[in-house]
């Protein structure tokens, strides 16, 4: 008997590794002699660093970088077990949660700290990057990040522009001569699950600006600034980023990253599936178990359980999902490779208590799932 356990984290309760371990514990009460493969998963969003560090026996690197409003903030990134890959979450340096609601203003916020994380990882000699760009506070086209890496965005006085989305309107020249040369030797995979272009009614400013504090007038100003940046970038860097799918992700960070030498925008879950070689483990599995904190109709939009299920179904393997909770529309996942879904909440209660009981409830639910499977396998 072989079980592959490949869940995402249960947010605010358990990491993906803790979820996988709890499921294994429950199953071992019924199948003590089975073979178990635990693969902590993620979809490129929050928790991706921790999951990939755990899955590769890597480590977290703590550091201090520039926060969205220019002050300093404690941050981190992950290093894979072999030391060759850095895993970075943009939100750890340039995240919306780092800016108090009353101070959120994408005219002013910068992605400079994300560039500093990349540079710190380069100092460790990494060969590749996985970069998650969700949850950002910025709308600066990734220019702050590029500045931290040595790219010069100069104004009419031949001086570097300042921080923030508004400053992009002042760019008259982009000089790549001082861009960190080590970037020529590394490949960057960007976890990007949106297809928005850089500018226009479906662009970064219009779609994502308001949630970062932009008023309707700010949206117009930011969009014009990004459009101007794209024009200068095409002239000075020879790359057309305005209409590229995904360029509008994370306030234009997708577009800014495309100006670097070797960058690929890719679905977050696919990056993780490929890096952890899930397909190699499910080929000879008897059952695949996945899960996440909540399963609903949104789960089919690039979330971990469906990514795992689709991989398993290439080999016609049964897939069971265990979730913290379910919404009424959860059954849509049955059309996307998941065969059964089990919630772990056993009784109503205060949310904080339910979160505290998450591990024990997960073990108990996993044991019950295993007991059902025992009818087939024993």
Swiss-Prot record:
GO terms for molecular function: ATP binding; glycerate 2-kinase activity; glycerate kinase activity. This is Glycerate kinase. The keyword Kinase applies. The gene is glxK. NCBIfam families: glycerate kinase (TIGR00045). Belongs to the glycerate kinase type-1 family. InterPro entries: Glyc_kinase_flavodox-like_fold (IPR018193), Glycerate_kinase (IPR004381), Glycerate_kinase_RE-like (IPR018197), Glycerate_kinase_sf (IPR036129). It comes from Haemophilus influenzae (strain ATCC 51907 / DSM 11121 / KW20 / Rd). It catalyses: (R)-glycerate + ATP = (2R)-3-phosphoglycerate + ADP + H(+). Keywords: ATP-binding, Kinase, Nucleotide-binding, Transferase. Pfam families: Gly_kinase. It is an enzyme of class 2 (transferase). GO terms for biological process: organic acid phosphorylation. It comes from the Bacteria. Its EC number is 2.7.1.31.
